[in-house]
Swiss-Prot record:
Entry's family note: Belongs to the aspartate/ornithine carbamoyltransferase superfamily. OTCase family.
Pathway: Amino-acid degradation; L-arginine degradation via ADI pathway; carbamoyl phosphate from L-arginine: step 2/2
Protein name (database record): Ornithine carbamoyltransferase
EC code(s) of this entry: 2.1.3.3
Subcellular location: Cytoplasm
GO cellular component term of the entry, any: cytoplasm
Keyword Transferase carried by entry: yes
Length: 333
């Protein structure tokens, strides 16, 4: 057992491998309890504030359902539902909400915002996504890998393919080195991963037995991998010029059936944090088709819908792992 009561959950950098495994074990146990109808509520009477400066499907639903399952009440503060950063500073917001709520989730922009909330709130603060990191997603990813592979995380070979500069590349690398994994970022040289973070992760890897490889060579990067992972290439609201340059650079890095074959591993799996641009069935998908002539972006539709894809198991596990974070840091033990 680990006492994580009142701890903030801002980045996996703040946790030991044993503590991360504790979150994963707790999530597994909570998932089993939910499935069997034996869940014990450990957050009765708790009040939780959910601050979303960016829209969300999985993260919001995971926090709301997880809290409800555990007997807590939530207040959702959407992109237009609070004054944070506009009329009121993050520090002031934290001191107000910390007097009314038992825990605060933040999904938004800079990592410094969630860190400021944590500094001033006086209650546990959880990072639901920032521009630099996405730690709750990594717990869901690792729980899903545990469920699909009969070997420990430190024997997993894992490649993140695509935009090496985005928050998922950062977050996965942090989690992977903590857990001793063979981790590769396969990305064009023109989109480099943060050098300071890479250096820090290599220091951790030296202690945990992990391996970190940054390469633009797809064949070399995915060889022998158990998991191929990708994320969207561009974010909504970025200018057309960014879309054009990113698409040109990243189209060769689309994860497809051929790339799965390149792993040489018949048991390889495909993962994605979602949403994914794999067809023309969305407004964005249609716009991409009209502007750039592409029916699929970071992943082929064929692979997304194939037996190799475990993206919906991964999405479900967002709820179980987020619930574990809340129970571990706020629940009655």
């Amino acid at each position: 057992m680990f006492n994580l009561k009142n701890r903030n959950f801002l980045t996996l950098m703040d946790f030991t491998p044993k503590e991360i495994n504790y979150f994963l074990d707790l999530a597994r146990d909570l998932k089993r309890a939910k499935y069997t109808g034996t869940e014990v509520q450990r957050m009765k009477g708790k009040n939780i504030a959910l601050i979303f400066e960016k829209a969300s499907t999985r993260t919001r639903c995971a926090f709301e359902v997880g809290a409800k399952d555990q007997g807590a009440h939530v207040t959702y503060l959407g992109p237009t539902g609070s004054h944070i950063g506009k009329k009121e500073s993050a520090a002031d917001t934290a001191r107000v909400l910390g007097r009314m709520y038992d825990g605060i989730e933040y999904r938004g922009f800079g990592q410094e915002i969630v860190e400021t909330l944590a500094e001033y709130a006086g209650v546990p603060v959880w990072n639901g996504l920032t521009d630099e990191d996405h730690p709750t997603q990594i717990l869901a990813d690792f729980l899903t890998i545990r469920e699909h592979f009969n070997k420990p995380l430190n024997e997993i070979k894992f490649a993140y393919v695509g935009d090496g500069a985005n928050n998922m590349a950062n977050a996965l690398m942090i989690g992977a080195v903590k857990m001793g994994m063979d981790f590769r970022i396969v990305s064009p040289k023109e989109i480099p991963t943060d050098a300071t973070l890479v250096a820090k992760c290599k220091e951790i890897a030296a202690e945990t037995g992990a391996k970190v490889t940054i390469t633009d060579n797809i064949e070399e990067g995915v060889k022998g991998c158990d998991v191929l992972y990708t994320d969207v290439w561009v974010s909504m609201g970025e200018p057309d010029s960014v879309w054009e340059s990113k698409i040109k650079l990243l189209t060769p890095y689309r994860v497809d059936m051929n790339m799965i074959k390149m792993t040489g591993n018949p048991d390889a799996k495909f993962m994605h944090c979602l949403p994914a641009f794999h067809d023309e069935e969305t407004a964005v998908g249609k716009e991409i088709k009209e502007k750039y002539g592409l029916s699929e972006m970071e992943v082929s539709h064929e692979l997304f819908e194939s037996k190799y894809s475990i993206v919906f198991d991964e999405a479900e596990n967002r709820m179980h792992t987020i619930k574990a974070v809340m129970v571990a840091t706020l629940g009655d033990q």
